Each structure stands twice: as structure tokens, then as C-alpha cells.
């Protein structure tokens, strides 16, 4: 049967859209995923192993794109792990459940997007969530009974208490709920895991209903090469299955949910984008929308490293570390607890660099291993890595097709630090977190600063940042929402400007990047986008 809706991409937003649409038995929904289906065994369920094995190199489960050389990074290329397969990025990520700041969303509404303020989107955050800590009925900030399982880490790691003590010695407050009344402060990370196992979007929204809902269909290993149009109406897709291209028509709408980089690429390959770019690529222009692929934002990330010798609670490459890992794997198999339940970024927090700042400027992630360069550069030591994330970058980049072939990677140009305020804020953010390592609690444990010991001046720190910074895997806003077709791609109902039957529903529509990890906001956008579709097709 011809589907009513075709959803392209099974990341957090796409899975939410497909699942919620199919709750209505009148809607026949086809979810298309370019990558494989469900992974089995340890690599599918163990959070740490999945990130290490699949996140460090391109594979069937990781698009693994490289950026263009970036002047802001002294000409370096930034590697971009990107989940491929059922669940999308939730199969590779660090599982952190963070929403951002309420003022982020009020800013979306004030920019001309009615219905996207904090009070509008909070119900959709709650609808997606099944929080095991904040589980009281009627909790004003958290949901219970939603598809996305949120729980505390099960690592039983004493470093949670140690870092809490060090942060408090540095004057940084403990915050029991970073997604609650206030964002400032630190706590152990809440994670999207279920019983000590990775809980990805496909498990949350799709797999429980396959076979139970005859109107929901999933097809994996099915990359969409372009959206099909008749005039200005999207009528279906061209998809590659088993080495053969075929066309599938949609009776109602096509929904692009391919993420912060690939949604813009698919629109451009389909003739929707800047007309001059499409002409250079030899593609016909269906709709001239110059904002497609523009306004790319990301949380640029600088990683610090501190050597803490022989600590059995830190993941490390050493004989002791190997023995600890073997013991931890045995415990994980028996109890689903211990080191092998780690998401690595076990403690996180948010800080304003100026007391009068309206929202936090920096997010810190304390990682229980010395891992740099996306896990591809691992020290043969034990220690802590500290990620310093710029929450509200002023720099803007772009993502564009590099050829008319769907197989070719897009040209990703982040233009990190192209706005001078970003580098100055990052330098101050690095200096601030080093205060934590200069507390009595940390001085007694840390043997060496492995990354910034040579830095003395702001210029030293700025050069260090340029030499090591890269992505924190949060590309957004390349199909941003807004009222003006000259500067945005979709309207407040997520309809592509000037076209019919086509919406974009994922992190690419964020008008500005939220101040926190982007998976929870992507689930929210999927939930709200599905509600808009159901309203329009009652």
C-alpha cells in the first residue's frame, strides 16, 4: 500500500515522528533508514563499547565525515562521527539528557516562531521522557511514562563525589536537576539508558510497535537519493534498495529527518536550495531557498587532560586498566552495573562566565578516561579529560553538496572562531575549569596537566584552543525555522517555504543552537512536529 507519510531518517526526531503518526491507524507511515537495522549483542547494548568501536572511524554504522580545513582551527580538519542505522546518532552518542535553557526556546519564539517558546515546548519534552529519578506524578519539569528512558548512571564511581567536592571548593554549586528550575551548576550526568544499557531512538519509539501496528513500516539499508516533486509539491522519494533505485510515492507528505548535516544535503540534491549552487552542480532548481545549508552551528569543544596515576575507577590503557575492564565486563554481564555502563562523560555542568549573563556560557563534561580526538588518541595512562563546550556560538558555518552524487560526503565548513567573541569566551572557559584542578581535592590526586601546562597568557590559551578544538557532535540549524524565506528554510509548522507536502523535522530546524546537548531537543522537535502533522491531517 502506498504510504501516507514517508519519514527519511531514523534518528531521535524521525523515530518520534514515525511512531506518533502511526498511533492513528488511519495514517500509513513508512520510515526509511540509510543504514542497518538493530545491532545485536555487546556492541548494540553496551554504551561504552558502541561509542568506542563505531564512533572512531567510518563504517556501516557511522558516516564519519571530515570537515573542510578550518582557518579557525589553524587549517585543521574536524572529524564528524555521525550515527548511521536505526536510532541514528543515539547509537553512538554519550547519551546525555540535557535540554538547554528555557530562554533558548523563548528566543526561538521571539525570532518569529510562534508556538516554540519554553512553555510551548516543555510539554513535548515531558511527553518523550520516562525519568526514573524525577518520577513523582505531576513533576513540573519531567515526564513519566514516555518512550525515552532517562536514569542515573550505574557506574558507582567514587569520582562523582570527588568532583562534586572539587567543584564546590572552586565555588561552583551542585545542582540536583540540570533540566529543572535552574541550569547552573554540576551533577552526575543523567543518561538515556535503560537498566544499564544504551537505549536508542529505535528501541524507544519504533521496535515496540513493529508488527503491532500494521500501518507502521521500517525499511533499513534504504538511502534516499532525492525527494520527488510534481511542480511545487513533494510526491515521494527515490530510494536505493539492493543496488537498484526505485520510487515510492507518498499520499500526503514527505518528512525529512536526516539531521543537522544530511537534511540540508538531501534538500539540495532534490533541487531545494541556493539556485546558484544547484546550477553549478547541474541540478534543476525546484525552489530557490538560499538559507538551505547556511547558518550551521555547533558547540565547538576544547578537551583538557590530567594524569591521575593508577586510579582503578578511571578507564585507562595499562595492565591494571585491562584487569579492571575484564572485571567490569563480568559485572556488567551479571548486574548491568559498574564501569562498563559508563557514558564516559559522567559529570557535567553549566557556568556563566559573568554574573550578569542571562544564560550559562560554557558546559563542562568530565570524562573518566584520557581520550582526545574523538577517542582516536588515547593516552596510555589513567586520568580525566575535561570537555569545554561553547554553548552559544556567534560563528556560523555551512554545509553544502560537493557534487550531484548522493554517495559523496557534503562539504562541511564550520568556521569555528570566525567571530572573535567565541575564542575569547572559550579561553575564559578553559581558564575557569583549571581552577577545579587547582583545588586541594584535585592537587592531591593529579600528577600532571597534559595539555595546558605550557600556557601562561591569553594568547597561549587562544593558540592552544585553535590547535585542539573540534566538534562536540551537535551540528544544527542548517535548515533553520523562521518567517522569512530569504533567511530560513521552514516555517513555524516546519513546512518548507514555498513548497507543499514537504517538512523538515529534526535538529537542522533549530533557529539557534540550544545551550546543552542536542538529543533531548531533537526528541522534542520530533514530538511537536508529529503533533503539528496530526493537527493538519485530522
Q: What does each of the following model-derived ranges do?
A:
Residues 1-538:
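N-terminal redox-cofactor-binding region of secreted/periplasmic oxidoreductases
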Amino acid at each position: 500500500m502506498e504510504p501516507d507519510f514517508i519519514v527519511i531518517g531514523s534518528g531521535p526526531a524521525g523515530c518520534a515522528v514515525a511512531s506518533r503518526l502511526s498511533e492513528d491507524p488511519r495514517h500509513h507511515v513508512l520510515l526509511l533508514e540509510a543504514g542497518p537495522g538493530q545491532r545485536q549483542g555487546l556492541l548494540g547494548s553496551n554504551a561504552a563499547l558502541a561509542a568506542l568501536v563505531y564512533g572512531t572511524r567510518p563504517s556501516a554504522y557511522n558516516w564519519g565525515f571530515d570537515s573542510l580545513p578550518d582557518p579557525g582551527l589553524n587549517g585543521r580538519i574536524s572529524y564528524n562521527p555521525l550515527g548511521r542505522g536505526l536510532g541514528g546518532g543515539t547509537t553512538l552518542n554519550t547519551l546525555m539528557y540535557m535540554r538547554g535553557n528555557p530562554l533558548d526556546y523563548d528566543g526561538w519564539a521571539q525570532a518569529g516562531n510562534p508556538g516554540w517558546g519554553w512553555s510551548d515546548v516543555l510539554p513535548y519534552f515531558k511527553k518523550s521522557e520516562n525519568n526514573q529519578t524525577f518520577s513523582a506524578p505531576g513533576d513540573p519539569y519531567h515526564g513519566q511514562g514516555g518512550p525515552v528512558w532517562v536514569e542515573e548512571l550505574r557506574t558507582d564511581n567514587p569520582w562523582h563525589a570527588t568532583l562534586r567536592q572539587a567543584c564546590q571548593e572552586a565555588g561552583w554549586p551542585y545542582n540536583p536537576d540540570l533540566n529543572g528550575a535552574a541550569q547552573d551548576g554540576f551533577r552526575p550526568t543523567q543518561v538515556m539508558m535503560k537498566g544499564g544499557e544504551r537505549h536508542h531512538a529505535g528501541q524507544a519509539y519504533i521496535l515496540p510497535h513493529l508488527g503491532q501496528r500494521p500501518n507502521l513500516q521500517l525499511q533499513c539499508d534504504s538511502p534516499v537519493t532525492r525527494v520527488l516533486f510534481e511542480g511545487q509539491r513533494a510526491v515521494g522519494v527515490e530510494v536505493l534498495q539492493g543496488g537498484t533505485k526505485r520510487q515510492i510515492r507518498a499520499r500526503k507528505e514527505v518528512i525529512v529527518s536526516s539531521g543537522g548535516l544530511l537534511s540540508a544535503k538531501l534538500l539540495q540534491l532534490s533541487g531545494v536550495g541556493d539556485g546558484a549552487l544547484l546550477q553549478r552542480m547541474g541540478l534543476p532548481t525546484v525552489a530557490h531557498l538560499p538559507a538551505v545549508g547556511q547558518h550551521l552551528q555547533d558547540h565547538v569543544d576544547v578537551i583538557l587532560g590530567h594524569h591521575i596515576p593508577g586510579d582503578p575507577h578511571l578507564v585507562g590503557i595499562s595492565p591494571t586498566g585491562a584487569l579492571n575492564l575484564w572485571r567490569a565486563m563480568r559485572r556488567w554481564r551479571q548486574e548491568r552495573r559498574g564501569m562498563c555502563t559508563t557514558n564516559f562523560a559522567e559529570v557535567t555542568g553549566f557556568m556563566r562566565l559573568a554574573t550578569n549573563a542571562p544564560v550559562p556560557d560554557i558546559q563542562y563534561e568530565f570524562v573518566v578516561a584520557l581520550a582526545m580526538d574523538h577517542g582516536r588518541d588515547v593516552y596510555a595512562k589513567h586520568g580525566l579529560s575535561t570537555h569545554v563546550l561553547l554553548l552559544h556560538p556567534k560563528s556560523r558555518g555551512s554545509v553544502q553538496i560537493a557534487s550531484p552524487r548522493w554517495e559523496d560526503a557534503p562539504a562541511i565548513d564550520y568556521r569555528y572562531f570566525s567571530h572573535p567573541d567565541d575564542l575569547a569566551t572559550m579561553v575564559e572557559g578553559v581558564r575557569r575549569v583549571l581552577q577545579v584542578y587547582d583545588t586541594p581535592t584535585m592537587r592531591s590526586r593529579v600528577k600532571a596537566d597534559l595539555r595546558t601546562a605550557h600556557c601562561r597568557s591569553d594568547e597561549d590559551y587562544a593558540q592552544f584552543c585553535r590547535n585542539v578544538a573540534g566538534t562536540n557532535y551537535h551540528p544544527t540549524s542548517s535548515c533553520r525555522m523562521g518567517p522569512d524565506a530569504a533567511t530560513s528554510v521552514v516555517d513555524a509548522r516546519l513546512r518548507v517555504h514555498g513548497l507543499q507536502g514537504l517538512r523538515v523535522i529534526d535538529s537542522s530546524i533549530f533557529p539557534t543552537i540550544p545551550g546543552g546537548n542536542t538529543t533531548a531537543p531533537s526528541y522534542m522537535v520530533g514530538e511537536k512536529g508529529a503533533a503539528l502533522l496530526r493537527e493538519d491531517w485530522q
